């Protein structure tokens, strides 16, 4: 399985979230709401998640092996580094501050 498209929107927020991302896999399946997060050791790609009733975050889609995780990370970060435009995002949720780094 290959990442065949990355759509990325850098955003300006007070939190650690730096971009919202959608990826296409094998030109056949789209995953929305990935995020580029500023962690303690640098930027990383967080998978789409939802808050559970106990306040924790749980991924709703994620790779099941390290090779696919690395492919997603590499593809997203390549586009992130190539994107200059930053959009102020008034609707960004501050939930990114509770993500683990």
From Swiss-Prot:
Q: What is a biological process (GO) this protein takes part in?
A: sporulation resulting in formation of a cellular spore
UniProt KW keywords:
Cell cycle, Cell division, Septation
Query: What is the organism lineage in this UniProt record?
Result: Bacteria, Bacillati, Bacillota, Bacilli, Bacillales
Pfam families associated with the record = SpoVG
What PANTHER family does this protein's entry cite? SEPTATION PROTEIN SPOVG-RELATED (PTHR38429:SF1)
What is known about what this protein does? Could be involved in septation.
Q: Which family does it belong to?
A: Belongs to the SpoVG family.
Q: Which organism is it from?
A: Staphylococcus saprophyticus subsp. saprophyticus (strain ATCC 15305 / DSM 20229 / NCIMB 8711 / NCTC 7292 / S-41)
Identify the domain of life.
Bacteria
Q: What is the protein name stated in its UniProt record?
A: Putative septation protein SpoVG
Q: Does Cell inner membrane appear among the keywords?
A: no
